[in-house]
Amino acid sequence: MPNSEIGMLLTYLAATADRNMETASSYLSPDVKLVFPQGQFDSLSQMAESMAGRYLSMGKTHDTWDISTAEERTVVVTTGTLHGVNLHGVAFAGVRFCDRFVVRSGLISEQHVWNDLAESGVLDSR
């Protein structure tokens, strides 16, 4: 049911934003593929290590959710904007993002992330 996927994804994203990797990891399949602008990762700990030193906090405001279910998977695409605080303590908002998730058997098997953080310059603002 699509609403259950959205609820699960929101819980997962909140746990990652809060850096509660144990809870967030419980939503991932053992063979998860995490693809971010900084590279591809097989675990949240790898992803978090790569993201360390980029910003102090990050959150998402979701504008759209698109869901497609076929055979044994559900694909969910969400778009919106990022907000947070960079390493210099400067708040930012309004940075575009797009996340694509593949959910199989109730677990996230893929997460693909696109955003305009690098292009926007907000991480370097002082």
What are these regions (language model features)?
Residues L28, L82-G84, N115:
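Short beta-strand segments enriched in hydrophobic/aromatic residues
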Residues Y12, T23-S25, V32, M47, ...:
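Hydrophobic pocket/interface hotspot
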Residues G7, K60-H62, F92-V95:
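Short solvent-exposed loop/turn micro-motifs enriched in small/polar/acidic residues
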Residues T81-S105:
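Exposed beta-sheet edge and beta->alpha loop/turn motif
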Residues E72-L82:
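A short hydrophobic beta-strand element
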Residues E110-R126:
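Low-complexity, intrinsically disordered terminal/linker segments enriched in charged
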Residues M1-S26, P30, S125:
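Short, low-complexity N-terminal intrinsically disordered segments enriched in polar/charged residues
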Residues M21-T74:
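A solvent-exposed, acidic/Ser-Thr-rich amphipathic alpha-helical stretch
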